[in-house]
Amino acid sequence: MKEIITKYPHLLHGGDYNPEQWIDCPKVLEEDIRLMKEAHVNCVSLGIFSWAKLEPEEGEFHFGWLRRIIDHLFENGIYTILATPTGAMPHWMTAKYEEVRQMGPDGVRNLPGRRHNFCYTSPVMRKKMKKINHELSRHLGNHPGVILWHISNEYGGNGS
């Protein structure tokens, strides 16, 4: 049987990791990696809910923080399963483009602030998702520590 993952042909052991929550606390990141190594973690899923941190303002992309984390994980023998960050939209998007928010059966759009609150049929939403995913792949897709891509989180988890 041909190996699907040629970079690491062993059982992957890890889970979701959301370090953007404590990006300004390097000691927490160091301790996390220490604990991961102690637990024999060899991969983590990164970026699932990081859109607001990756694109804090429309068209303004910040990938350096994520690259540094992927670098540090890789230096410690931990691969990254890089997620498309579309599980949660940034606030600027829901505030500027009402049509990107999901609409309930009553015809009323959901309020901002929910995960998976996007409207699949919104051309704006599709364009913005395509852009963030393209930029993410352009900046980090060839990183040696990226072993797999995690495409969308909990597809259909928004009640659609």
Task: List each model region and its residues.
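Boundary/entry segment of secreted carbohydrate-active catalytic domains
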Residues: I4-C25
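Short, contiguous strand/loop micro-motifs
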Residues: N18-E20, E55-E57, Y120
